[in-house]
Amino acid sequence: MAKSSDARSPAPHAAAPERVAAFRTGISAEARAAAYLIAKGYRIVARRFRTPYGEIDLVARRRNLLAFVEVKARAKLDDAAYAVTPRQQQRIIDAAQAWLMAHPEHADFELRFDAVLIAPKSLPRHLPAAFDASP
C-alpha cells in the first residue's frame, strides 16, 4: 500500500511567506501609483512589463510624453526615495529600450524616467525625471 502524503506539507515550490507578502505589497503599491498618475492626467499604457533586463512597473503616457515609472513602497516616503539604486536605474533604462523595441509606435515620444513613492497613511509622491538615461 502506498503511503499518502501529508496534505499540510508545503508544495515543493511554494513561495516563502515574506516573498508572498512583498509581492502583494508591490501589487498594491503599483495600483495606488497608477490611480494617482491617472488622476494627474496620465494614461497607463503598460503594467509590470517583463523584459530580459527586468520589469518596468508602469509605463504612463500624457500627450507626447512617455514615462517609465518605478514604484517604491516603504514604511516612510523618505526611505522609498533612496530605494532606486544606480544599478536598478540601469536595469530600468535597459528594460525601457526593450519596451520601445516592442512598441515602435512610441519611438517619437519624449521619454522620461519617473518614480512614485508609496508609504502607508501618505499620499503617493510622484518624482518626475527621478533619473535620466544619459551616461
Swiss-Prot record:
Transmembrane segments: none annotated. It comes from Rhodopseudomonas palustris (strain BisB18). Signal peptide: none annotated. Belongs to the UPF0102 family. CDD domains: PoNe_Nuclease. This is UPF0102 protein RPC_0320. Pfam families: UPF0102 (PF02021). It comes from the Bacteria. GO terms for molecular function: nucleic acid binding.
